[in-house]
Amino acid sequence: MATAPAPARDWTVYRVGLTGGIASGKSFVATCFADLGVPVIDTDVLARDVVVPGSAGLQAVVQGFGTGVLKPDGSLDRPQLRHRVFADPAARARLDALLHPLILAAAEEQSRRLPGPYQIIVVPLLYESGFDARVDRVLAVDCPEALQRQRLGQRDGDDVAQIERILAAQRPGAALRARAHDHVDNSGTLAATRQRVGELHRTYLERALESAG
């Protein structure tokens, strides 16, 4: 069976897609790159931007899930919505179908406005959304599930059942590592993670220059 042709590369700045499971430390790794002067686009931030009050994204969510996902001030009740979608895979798929196109379009727009020589684009659901076809290289951030559970409990206050539902809905870390070009083990010290990011930064600079040449 013939494989589908790869999409045309219509971007000019070298792109690295940064992905990983929830509470794996993606934000810290992204911050390390930003500290080195690398432009970072975080789709978690864009996911909030596309559902601000009055936006088409919020209107679509309300149409799909009802006004029960709104706070009294009309903004999105994110914890309530998260609880609903992680308890119902079909609801999660429906939400992703509503918001992923808006989020990824915003990422594309931001990417075209930012400089190079390379950019980091943080996309937690990189493969599920199909955005892996829109980057030149993939970096996976990973840590043991026990550490993810600990971080989730401390950061978000989720109970054990909710944490297990969230982790069950994620692509396993081993699967991400197998598909990614590069990997950051974020279970060690902050200094070790920074050192690894520094190594990757040099690699990405070289690849970006090769791509531009």
Roles of regions detected by a PLM:
Residues 21, 64, 84, 98, ...:
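Amphipathic alpha-helical segments that mediate coupling or scaffolding at interfaces
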Residues 58-62, 145-153, 160, 164:
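An amphipathic alpha-helix signature
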Residues 45-118:
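ATP-dependent small-molecule kinase phosphotransfer cores
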Residues 106-107, 133-134, 154-205, 212-213:
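Small-molecule kinase domains that catalyze NTP-dependent phosphoryl transfer to phosphate-bearing small molecules
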Residues 1-76, 198, 202-213:
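Glycine-rich phosphate-binding loop of ATP-dependent small-molecule kinases
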